[in-house]
Amino acid sequence: MITLTPGHLTLPQLRKIAREPVQLTLDPASFAKIDAGAKAVADIAAKGEPAYGINTGFGRLASTHIPHDQLELLQKNLVLSHAVGVGEPMARSSVRLLMALKLSSLGRGHSGIRREVMDALITLFNADVLPLIPVKGSVGASGDLAPLAHMSAVLLGVGEVFIRGERASALDGLRVAGLAPLTLQAKEGLALLNGTQASTALALDNMFSIEDLYRTALVAGALSVDAAAGSVKPFDARIHELRGHRGQIEAAAAYRDLLDGSPINQSHRDCDKVQDPYSLRCQPQVMGACLDQMRHAADVLLIEANAVSDNPLIFPDTGEVLSGGNFHAEPVAFAADNLALAAAEIGALAERRIALLIDATLSGLPPFLVKDGGVNSGFMIAHVTAAALASENKTLAHPASVDSLPTSANQEDHVSMATFAARKLADIADNTKYILAIELLAAAQGVDLRAPYHTSPKLAPVMETIRSHVAHYELDHYFAPDIAVIAKLVGERAFAKAAPFSFASEQ
C-alpha cells in the first residue's frame, strides 16, 4: 500500500505504482484542504457571480454564463464532449500513473473537487478497474483533455475499462468496484480534465524503461570492450575528473567496476595498439551526457508529478479563483524530448559497437563473428536490423516541442505537444531494447572467440545468462528467436541488475 501525500510523491513511489501491483490510499492530512476547496467552489456557484469553469463555458466560450440549474449538465457535457481520443489503449502502467498523478494534483485542495469523486478514483484503482484511455488526441494544452476525459467518463458510467486486464464497459467496471455512476458538481469535470497527468504519466513510465536500458547499455558496452579486446585505460578516473561532468565520472566508474579483473583485458595490456575507436573509448563521455540529461528530466517530471496543473485554481483562504496556464505542459515536453535524445544515443552508440565487433579489421575477430564465413553470414544482417532501428530512433528523437498548432478558435494558440513527445519514447525504448539485445549476443560471441581467456568476474554472470538461453553461434540458423529471447530478458532487467549503478527511482 502506498500512501499518496499530495505534493510529496517520490520517484520510487511512482516507479512502484507503474511496475508493481500496489494499492493506494490518500493521506488523511490532505482532507481538510480538499474539503475547503470544494466548499469554496460550492459557495461561488451559490452566489451566481461569473467564475470561469464554474458557471461559464470553456475555451472560446468562456464568456458564456451558465445558469445554476445547468451546472451539473455543464460538467457532464464537458466530459462527454472531450472524450475524443483515438488509437490504441494507453498502457496499463501509464494509466495507473495517470490516476495517481491526478489524485495528487486534486488532493492539494486547489481544484474544488469533492472527496467523494477522489475516493471513487481510488476505489477503481485498487479494484484493478482501469479506464480504457486512447493514447492519441492531446496537444498538451489546455492540459491532456481527451485522455483525462476518457478517465473521467468512467466515473459517469460511460466508456470502457479493463477489469483485471479484460476489456469491459464502464458500467460493468463500476459494478465490480462497488460503485454507482457519479453526478459531477460545479467545476468537478473541469478539475478532472485539466492537467498534465497523461503526458507526465507517459513520460515517467517510459523514463523508467529508459533507465533500465541505460544500465543494460553499461553492461553491454563493457562486454563489448572485452569482446573487441579494448583498453580500460580510457576509463581512468583521472581523465574524467579533469572534465568534471558528474554523469561522465560515474559512467567511467561503472565501466572500471564491470571490467575489473578481466583476463581478456590482462592478456593484451602490452599490445602495440594505441587507441580504440570512439564507440569503445568515449563511452563515459557519451553515456555520461545521457545520464545527466536523464537526471534532469527526472527532476522536471517529479516536480510536475507533484504540481497543481488545473485551471482555474481555487484559493480557499481568500475565496479567489485565479485563471492561469499551469496546464501548459512545456516542461514535460522538454523533459520528454531530452529523454528521447538520450535513449536514441544509447541505441546509436550500441549500434556502432556492433558494427565494430563484426568488422574483422577493427575487432580482430572472425568476419561477422562466425567461423567459415562465406557459407555462413553470422551477425551480418543482425547488424542491419540494429542499424535500421538506430536510424528510426533518430527520426523519432526529433523534438515534438518545437511544433505547435493553434486550437479552440485560436484561444489556445500555442501548445506543447508534450503527450506526443512522451508517447514516442515508448517506440524509441523498444527499438533500443532490440539494439542492446543484438549487441549482447554479438559481444558474448566475441568473448567466446577470445578463448581461452574469459571476461571479468562481474561480467561472467552476464555471459552465463546469455548462454543459458542462446547457444554460441556455430552455424547459420533461424536467428530471430535468439534476438527475441535476449530482448525479453533486457525488458525484464536481467542485465540491468549487473550494472554497479542505480537511479533515484530505484532507491
Swiss-Prot record:
SUPFAM superfamilies to which the protein is assigned, alphabetical: L-aspartase-like
Superkingdom, taxonomy of origin: Bacteria
Pfam families assigned to the protein according to its UniProt record, in alphabetical order: Lyase_aromatic
This enzyme's EC code(s): 4.3.1.3
Pathway(s) this gene product operates in, as recorded in its UniProt entry: Amino-acid degradation; L-histidine degradation into L-glutamate; N-formimidoyl-L-glutamate from L-histidine: step 1/3
Chain positions of cross-link 5-imidazolinone (Ala-Gly): 141-143
Reported modifications of this chain: Contains an active site 4-methylidene-imidazol-5-one (MIO), which is formed autocatalytically by cyclization and dehydration of residues Ala-Ser-Gly.
Entry's Gene Ontology BP terms: L-histidine catabolic process to glutamate and formamide; L-histidine catabolic process to glutamate and formate
Residue spans crossing the bilayer: none
Similarity field: Belongs to the PAL/histidase family.
Protein's name in the database: Histidine ammonia-lyase
Species lineage: Bacteria, Pseudomonadati, Pseudomonadota, Betaproteobacteria, Burkholderiales
